[in-house]
């Protein structure tokens, strides 16, 4: 738990990831089996109880992204803006081409967030190579399918060398 103060009243975020003492990610965890979902309660919590004027939540000053997840789905926002906060899914999609994540024996459907995206080297790479502020002032965080496609292409080029032809077909 990460405790911060909002006008002398302590508040908590379930998890915070720091890099050299600087908060780079905040994570709210929900449990759908307890009646909470990332897509409803988690997003509402960020939109209504996290003041974007707090230093720790200030855009482009401290925290780079905000995850909310339950056992089945994960979502990310790069800027807290009260009720206007926009979340995008960070899910792999199902084998049938649907939204969400596939079910794998012995793993939560959102294990890819822990095992891949928040893995130390990958998190540093996302911060270094993929997070950026576009011309409109929006922080861009790679969607899972985009990052996955780029990593597969890189791996193939390393194995086969340059000069290959690729068609990347993806949808969110």
Each model region followed by its residue ranges:
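ATP-dependent helicase/translocase motor core
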Residues: 1-172
